[in-house]
Regions:
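Glycine-rich FAD cofactor-binding loop and adjacent beta-loop-alpha segment at the N-terminus
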Residues: 2-89
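Conserved N-terminal helical subregion
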Residues: 3-5, 70-200
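Hydrophobic "anchor" residues on beta-strands that sit immediately upstream
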Residues: 10, 35, 174-176, 308
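Intrinsically disordered, low-complexity terminal tails and inter-domain linkers enriched
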Residues: 42-58, 100-104, 137-170, 242-257, ...
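Conserved FAD-binding catalytic core of PHBH/FMO-like flavoproteins
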Residues: 172-285
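FAD/FMN-dependent oxidoreductases across multiple families
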Residues: 242-347, 351-356
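C-terminal helical "tail/cap" subdomain of flavin- and related membrane-associated enzymes
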Residues: 337-427
């Protein structure tokens, strides 16, 4: 069976965690042959050039990402190890500044509640990409775009590699997976008119492995573990005008008292027990919008071509629940299983192969649409409703009820594995 020529050609377009994870998950699931993993290049539908890719990589390199316990299981299953980072062993949810005014007064979820080693891990973008790239390319071949390569050179290299691959007959199907970039001009948007101040702050009093999600009247605030016990990663959301004003205040400099003014405001937003010592000057203001493709699968039987969008190419979420990356990794995991099943059907030489393949892809789309839209609706409503008076007044009472053991366990499991079927995907 191994010698039977394949009738499906695969290409993975992307340079980030989504593309690299899909490549590695395909290998883990038993994919035979080349996955077609390639760097971004200039193509007709407006995807980024090599020069733009290098600029994007530079800006992303130090960005902190929160991986859930489920995502860590997936990464370990397909690479054999975990990327270096800082474990989240405890997550505290607080609503309002009065109902929970100090550390420990909110809903506290611990890794021991689910007998896990951690509820999640905070890693940098570059660390995660390097980890997946190293594991995906055991022979030393890197997917990183070499510095100085012009877009047309990159296109020529890709064309040469295409010509060197196994020749497929005219009846071959071509499957392209778009795993990075923007959901596109036609993406559906949900705009809560919020921006976030993101970056490193210096604190004292934070328990080891502790993460905070605090829903305040002007927007959600999150603290995540960082490189040292004296620092944490801040995500401070508010309406766009207020966030931009806060950043301008910081940029005024010490002479105008800008940093001290922002420190005072942030101290008022943090719970008692967390002493804010300083702010990293590299804080940034990021506009927050949920953008998502309505369709993530396009099949053209006449051309025997399939396009699939996953991860950042399919959706970008508001960070209120910290689940965007985890959703993208679930996209990759389910697509890997689907594609390997399609290849197995080819190897077996089953009849009605095209119909079976289309059916499997449609089933993948159905599963992913259910998962992604459920999570997007949750994050959309949290971002929009959490600043409303009724939420600030009533939700603290609901949070007290959530401290009951069974309900708390459900919430903890949802945080760790997402609002979907049981994990991990791989037994």
């Amino acid at each position: 069976m191994r010698g039977k020529p394949l009738m499906t050609r695969l290409e993975i377009h992307g340079h980030g965690p989504g593309a690299l994870a899909l490549h590695r998950m395909l290998q883990r699931e038993g994919w035979e042959g080349d996955t077609g993993l390639r760097e971004r290049q200039q193509v007709s539908d407006g995807h980024t050039t090599a020069k733009a890719l290098q600029a994007a990589q530079a800006s992303l390199a130090t960005r902190s990402l929160a991986l859930s316990a489920g995502s860590l299981q997936l990464i370990k299953a397909c690479t054999g190890s975990l990327p270096a980072g800082n474990d989240i062993t405890c997550v505290e949810v607080q609503i309002g500044a009065h109902a929970a005014s100090a550390v420990g007064e909110g809903l506290v979820m611990r890794h021991s509640d689910l007998a896990l080693e951690q509820l999640g891990r905070v890693v940098s973008w570059s660390t995660l990409v390097d980890h997946l790239d190293a594991k995906a390319m055991p022979r030393g071949r890197s997917t990183a775009a070499p510095l100085g390569i012009a877009p047309h050179d990159l296109g020529e290299r890709s064309l040469q590699r295409d010509q060197g691959t196994t020749t497929c007959s005219k009846s071959a199907w071509h499957i392209r997976v778009w795993a990075d970039g923007d959901p596109g001009e036609d993406a559906l948007e949900e705009d809560a008119d919020q921006s976030a101040i993101v970056g490193r702050v210096y604190v004292r009093g934070a328990p080891q492995g502790w993460a905070l999600e605090r829903f305040l009247a002007d927007g959600p605030l999150a603290l995540l573990p960082d490189q040292s016990p004296q620092s944490m990663q801040l995500v401070w959301c508010a309406n766009a005008r207020q966030s931009e004003s806060r950043l301008r205040t910081l940029r005024e400099g010490p002479a105008q008292g800008g940093e001290q003014s922002l420190l005072r405001e942030l101290r008022m937003a943090l719970p008692k027990g967390i002493a804010l010592m300083g702010i990293d000057p590299g804080l940034q203001c990021v506009r927050l919008k949920r953008r998502a493709r309505a369709q993530i699968l396009q099949i053209c039987p006449e051309d025997r071509q399939v396009d699939v969008w996953i991860a950042n190419a399919a959706q970008s979420l508001h960070p209120v629940a910290g689940q965007g990356l985890n959703l993208g990794l679930r996209d990759a995991a389910e697509l890997a299983r689907c594609l390997v099943t399609i290849q197995h059907i080819e190897r077996q030489g089953e009849t009605a192969q095209a119909n079976r393949m289309i059916g499997l892809l449609r089933r993948f789309e159905e599963h992913r649409q259910r998962d992604r839209w459920l999570l997007m609706r949750i994050t959309d409503q949290l971002a929009r409703q959490s600043t409303r008076f009724w939420f600030q007044a009533l939700a603290p009472q609901a949070l007290k009820i959530a401290r009951q053991s069974q309900l708390k366990r459900f919430i903890t499991r949802t945080f760790a594995f997402g609002p979907r079927e049981a994990w991990p995907i791989w037994a």
